[in-house]
């Protein structure tokens, strides 16, 4: 196990994986990576990084904001010519341009940026064959949540519209250094290539923000639909009149979005 020489920064959402056997297990969830171009966000002390590099990958690009870790990774670059290390905030770079097929992402994501990074990547997530990512368990449960459950949210809908999602492993806080206050989960995200159901993604995103904006409101009240419009929606989409957005499946929400767009319904910004 590596020796910690630097204190983890809470502001960077750092919780390091230092046990090589644990890191190897996480990498294994990505399946075969030989010949792949891998992206790792938040490599930390490089425990998982070196395991990836020993797996005969075509290339590995690691992006790390903490400049204190650069010397360690520069040493790895000298050892592995197919390794590229960027010292930068991943939220401030154009990650899409750095993806080379065939590509997978394997990462113990900094918890403070995991959701916003994933939401941004949804625009080009089809460029990855697979993503094996570490999240806080609460976030992982949102990714795989079913309609009518407490964890079901906009994030659930968007990710499941674009990908197959599987929570493959829960990890206790003791697997990390320093131990986080919550449990963590490894999630496999496999992009579909196309939307699971036909829908205008940009329009649906606007609709979801309104529909999920007030969880206690029915779809009609959340969207501010006139009676006549709502009655037509009920007939077309076959949903109960008192239904809330969090009780509708991804397919049903797509149907609602398509119906409203066909009626050229515009959502108020208030």
Curated annotation (Swiss-Prot):
Molecular-function annotations in GO: 16S rRNA (adenine(1518)-N(6)/adenine(1519)-N(6))-dimethyltransferase activity; RNA binding
Pfam families: RrnaAD (PF00398)
Protein name: Ribosomal RNA small subunit methyltransferase A
Matching InterPro entries: KsgA/Erm (IPR001737), rRNA_Ade_diMease-like_C (IPR023165), rRNA_Ade_Mease_Trfase_CS (IPR020596), rRNA_Ade_methylase_Trfase_N (IPR020598), rRNA_adenine_dimethylase (IPR011530), SAM-dependent_MTases_sf (IPR029063)
Family: Belongs to the class I-like SAM-binding methyltransferase superfamily. rRNA adenine N(6)-methyltransferase family. RsmA subfamily.
Listed GO CC annotations: cytosol
Localization per Swiss-Prot or TrEMBL: Cytoplasm
Residues where S-adenosyl-L-methionine binds: 15, 17, 42, 64, 89, 108
PROSITE patterns: RRNA_A_DIMETH (PS01131), SAM_RNA_A_N6_MT (PS51689)
Catalytic activity: adenosine(1518)/adenosine(1519) in 16S rRNA + 4 S-adenosyl-L-methionine = N(6)-dimethyladenosine(1518)/N(6)-dimethyladenosine(1519) in 16S rRNA + 4 S-adenosyl-L-homocysteine + 4 H(+)
E.C. code: 2.1.1.182
Chief localization: cytoplasm
Swiss-Prot/TrEMBL keywords: Cytoplasm, Methyltransferase, RNA-binding, rRNA processing, S-adenosyl-L-methionine, Transferase
Stated role: Specifically dimethylates two adjacent adenosines (A1518 and A1519) in the loop of a conserved hairpin near the 3'-end of 16S rRNA in the 30S particle. May play a critical role in biogenesis of 30S subunits.
């Amino acid at each position: 196990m590596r020796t910690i020489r630097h204190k983890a920064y809470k502001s960077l959402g750092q919780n390091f994986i230092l046990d090589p056997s644990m890191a190897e297990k996480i990498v294994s969830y990505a399946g075969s990576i030989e010949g792949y171009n891998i992206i790792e966000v938040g490599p930390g002390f490089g425990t998982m990084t070196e395991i990836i590099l020993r797996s005969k990958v075509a290339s590995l690009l690691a992006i790390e904001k903490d400049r204190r870790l650069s010397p360690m990774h520069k040493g790895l670059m000298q050892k592995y010519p197919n390794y590229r290390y960027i010292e930068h905030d991943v939220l401030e770079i154009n990650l899409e341009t750095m993806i080379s097929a065939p590509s997978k992402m394997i990462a113990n994501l900094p918890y403070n940026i995991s959701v916003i990074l994933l939401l941004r990547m949804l625009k080009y997530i089809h460029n990855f064959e697979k993503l094996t990512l570490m999240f806080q368990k609460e976030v992982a449960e949102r990714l795989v949540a079913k309609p009518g459950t407490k964890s079901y949210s906009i994030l659930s809908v968007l990710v499941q519209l674009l990908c197959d999602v599987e929570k493959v492993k829960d990890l206790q806080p003791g697997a990390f250094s320093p131990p986080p206050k919550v449990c963590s989960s490894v999630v496999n995200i496999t992009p579909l290539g196309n939307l699971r159901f036909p829908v205008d993604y940009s329009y649906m995103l606007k609709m979801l923000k309104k529909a999920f904006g007030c969880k206690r409101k029915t779809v009609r009240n959340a969207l501010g639909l006139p009676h006549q419009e709502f009655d037509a929606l009920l007939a077309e989409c076959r949903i109960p009149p008192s239904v809330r957005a969090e009780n509708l499946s991804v397919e049903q929400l797509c149907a609602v979005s398509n119906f409203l767009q066909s009626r050229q319904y515009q959502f108020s910004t208030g």
